[in-house]
Amino acid sequence: MRPILLQGHERSITQIKYNRDGDLLFTVAKDPVVNVWYSVNGERLGTYNGHTGAVWCVDVDWETRHVLSGSADNSCRLWDCETGKQLALLQTNSAVRTCGFDFGGNIIMFSTDKQMGYQCFVSFIDLRDPSQIEDNEPYMKIPCSESKITSAVWGPLGENIIAGHENGELNHYSAKSGEIVNSIKEHSKQINDIQTSRDMTMFVTASKDCTSKLFDSTSLEHQKTFRTERPVNSAAVSPIYDHVVLGGGQEAMDVTTTSTRIGKFEARFFHVAFEEEFGRVKGHFGPINSLAFHPDGKSYSSGGEDGYVRIHYFDPQYFDFEFES
């Protein structure tokens, strides 16, 4: 499995995201650039320039018309996907940690960090109402006083968002009323990443407590647990098989103080039903920060602390593989 190496960032990767068709791959890092690549051959299509700080999150809508990015320069920006033109600039009081389009691409949500005396907020803006963008006035802002949000995605049908917190909590926030509909605490440490399955019925979390867990999207019921020996930074669900891929590794500041075994940085494949690991892919120099499966399930990509993004196309053996418990 020879990976395609994408080198378009000077700093460590923070998030990577495929569009719905899977022909484009969006990458952001701790530098101010948002990159977009052709996933088939790794050719860089272009960049979205405008941010002045590290970019923490990126999302693309269902029709690949708009791109959304959130940055440590205290702004969330909306871009025209095709031309790279900035369509909207939403100023915030603190860094934007997560962002996302809803199912129809009309409503965006983004969450801000708890820093510099400001509280963590989740904001919802309806793009069909120009006044909300011009006045920088979201139709709803939900304060999170307890623990800040570290990862968030839209739930099924755009009715609510699933948010993971610094203390390991998972919450369902209603996109209409802003109330917490459901709450669960299955992780003991920070939730680094949440990704839904292709049909949005399940989602997988990645946590600093060295586990990744599978949950039901509507009830938040805990289904499966995948255990590792090191913090998990990202996890993704295969769209065609009962597989999840986990990526992680020690934080950069802890690397010199731990044994080399804990500092390993492979992508690890687990079977969903049996919770068993069945494969590993080496490659990155340093921890893996973000993972994404291609929507057709025939390849996956990983972004690392080394600033590289690797696109891996699976070998034929992967598709013939039968898991025996």
Swiss-Prot record:
Component of the eukaryotic translation initiation factor 3 (eIF-3) complex, which is involved in protein synthesis of a specialized repertoire of mRNAs and, together with other initiation factors, stimulates binding of mRNA and methionyl-tRNAi to the 40S ribosome. The eIF-3 complex specifically targets and initiates translation of a subset of mRNAs involved in cell proliferation. One of its GO terms (molecular function) is RNA binding. The keyword Protein biosynthesis applies. The gene is eif3i. This is Eukaryotic translation initiation factor 3 subunit I. PANTHER family: EUKARYOTIC TRANSLATION INITIATION FACTOR 3 SUBUNIT I. It is found in: Cytoplasm. PROSITE patterns: WD_REPEATS_1 (PS00678), WD_REPEATS_2 (PS50082), WD_REPEATS_REGION (PS50294). It comes from Xenopus laevis. It holds the Pfam family EIF3I. The keyword Protein biosynthesis applies. Its main location: cytoplasm. GO terms for biological process: cytoplasmic translational initiation; formation of cytoplasmic translation initiation complex; translational initiation. WD repeats lie at residues 8-47, 50-91, 144-183, 186-225, 283-324. Component of the eukaryotic translation initiation factor 3 (eIF-3) complex, which is composed of 13 subunits: eif3a, eif3b, eif3c, eif3d, eif3e, eif3f, eif3g, eif3h, eif3i, eif3j, eif3k, eif3l and eif3m. Belongs to the eIF-3 subunit I family. The lineage of its organism: Eukaryota, Metazoa, Chordata, Craniata, Vertebrata. GO terms for cellular component: eukaryotic 43S preinitiation complex; eukaryotic 48S preinitiation complex; eukaryotic translation initiation factor 3 complex; eukaryotic translation initiation factor 3 complex, eIF3m. Keywords: Cytoplasm, Initiation factor, Protein biosynthesis, Repeat, WD repeat.
